[in-house]
A protein has these predicted regions:
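Active-site and adjacent substrate-binding regions of carbohydrate-active enzymes
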Residues: 1-235
């Protein structure tokens, strides 16, 4: 979102240069005395290589490519694109914070250029077929941003696939971030979407867990094994 901050008449008003970087540098100067690290968030197609520019400017960047690449690798039983991305992260020394699911949807726009267009469309269709929701932008089939679904449901609600996905995330370059609902193998919440009404598609992945649900979830094998992975990662 930071890329939309500086605006001026006649400019594209997305990542205006050098104003965008000047603004971030000002914020960094305020943050550093408090030992705070900036983590700029930006969604853009891989082919634009904006993630690389962010890294070259000395900032960490969100790895919005990983969620889709992991599903592609697991569902298509191939590591080609995922391995290429891991190699790039290491070779270019790009510092990331990665994730599988998050409070929003599973990023799709970001995959343009790192996955073939046909495979992105297949990925969208697969997740939608499993109960996910995609916002149709401008009425065009090939204009997309993200698919809203829990990561567990996107993987066909397979505990084995979720554990494999979490293990891949844990061992990928970067700092892992875990969305609480995915830790508890949360399923698509269509009732919450219905209650939210128009524009409430994001509620599919924002279920509020009760104290009892959390306590019961902590006893399940899928949660315990993820916690074991996270403890291993932190050692």
């Amino acid at each position: 979102a930071f890329a939309y901050a500086p605006k001026a008449p006649g400019r594209k008003n997305f990542l205006n240069e050098p104003e965008t970087w000047d603004l971030l540098e000002q914020i960094r100067m305020y943050a550093e005395p408090y030992e705070l690290t900036l983590l700029p968030e930006i969604h853009a197609a891989y082919e634009e290589h904006i993630y690389q520019t962010v890294a070259e400017k000395g900032y960490m960047t969100y790895d919005f490519f990983l969620p889709g690449l992991v599903i592609d690798a697991i569902e298509n039983k191939r590591s080609k694109y995922l391995a290429a991305w891991a190699k790039e992260l290491v070779e270019k020394k790009i510092n990331t914070v990665n994730m599988l699911g998050c409070h929003d949807g599973i990023p799709m726009l970001d995959l343009k250029g790192i996955l073939p267009e046909e495979d992105i469309q297949k990925l969208i269709a697969l997740i939608v077929d499993r109960g996910g929701m995609v916002k149709n932008l401008h009425g065009q089939k090939n204009v997309y941003y993200q698919v809203n679904a829990t990561y567990f449901s996107a993987l066909g609600e397979s505990e084995q696939k979720l554990l494999l996905a979490r293990a891949i995330q844990i061992f990928m370059p970067g700092k892992p971030q875990v969305w609480y609902l995915d830790l508890f193998a949360g399923k698509n919440d269509h009732e919450a979407v219905k209650e939210a009404g128009e524009g409430g598609h994001k509620e599919i992945n924002r279920t509020n867990l009760t104290d009892i649900q959390i306590r019961q979830g902590l006893q399940t094998d899928v949660v315990q094994k993820q916690l074991e992975l996270l403890r291993f990662r932190s050692t």
